[in-house]
């Protein structure tokens, strides 16, 4: 890893806060615990929770499509198992947000068909640049998602950390796993991708646009 990459990785690492918990602890009982601990459909900030669940569901769906595209190109190469492991975690993330969408009656973004195509195209397109291109995409996307999750964590902590305790735990857990994917990308030569810095900026600009649109539409 280059010196610049090491600094960036350290900076992202400082974003990690909270105590890690295994994903299995959340399970399907999350909804009951949310209600018993004070988070119900009646007493939450519905507008804020709607935005959080809708955009996070869209983001995890897009991440799944990115990894699907990468696996279509690199699935049979030596890096295939690495990508598959990250994809499996993203599948768990999407499953949880599917459950939250139903529990809190949140509609998905109308842009799902676009994220379906765009996510797969991004994953496959960067994978065609080789392992390094795919990992550069992973670094860019996962860093964007981790920062986005941190913004949500700060907002919920400021509003009512006890009321939103279970939702905060889910977001923190997923944030930490996204940062693990980010670090995996760096460990697998992301910075050796052609025009790495430019590619990363372009992908992260796209992520910012996707977040903005998915929160609102």
From Swiss-Prot:
Its EC number is 1.14.13.253. NADH binds at residues 51, 212, 216. Its main location: mitochondrion. One of its GO terms (cellular component) is mitochondrial inner membrane. InterPro entries: Ferritin-like_SF, Ubq_synth_Coq7. It catalyses: a 5-methoxy-2-methyl-3-(all-trans-polyprenyl)benzoquinone + NADH + O2 = a 3-demethylubiquinone + NAD(+) + H2O. Keywords: Iron, Membrane, Metal-binding, Mitochondrion, Mitochondrion inner membrane, Monooxygenase, NAD, Oxidoreductase, Repeat, Transit peptide, Ubiquinone biosynthesis. It is an enzyme of class 1 (oxidoreductase). It is a peripheral membrane protein. Sequence repeats lie at residues 48-129, 130-217. One of its GO terms (molecular function) is metal ion binding. CDD domains: DMQH. Fe cation 1 binds at residues 60, 90, 93, 178. Disruption phenotype: Mice lacking Coq7 start to die after E8. Heterozygous mutant reveal that the reduction of Coq7 levels in these animals profoundly alters their mitochondrial function despite the fact that ubiquinone production is unaffected. The mitochondria of young mutants heterozygous are dysfunctional, exhibiting reduced energy metabolism and a substantial increase in oxidative stress. Highly expressed in tissues with high energy demand such as heart, muscle, liver, and kidney. Component of a multi-subunit COQ enzyme complex. Interacts with COQ8B and COQ6. Interacts with COQ9. Catalyzes the hydroxylation of the 5-methoxy-2-methyl-3-(all-trans-polyprenyl)benzoquinone at the C6 position and participates in the biosynthesis of ubiquinone. Catalyzes the reaction through a substrate-mediated reduction pathway, whereby NADH shuttles electrons to 5-methoxy-2-methyl-3-(all-trans-decaprenyl)benzoquinone, which then transfers the electrons to the two Fe(3+) centers. In life-span analysis, transgenic expression reverted the extended life span of clk-1 to the comparable level with wild-type control. This is NADPH-dependent 3-demethoxyubiquinone 3-hydroxylase, mitochondrial. It comes from Mus musculus.
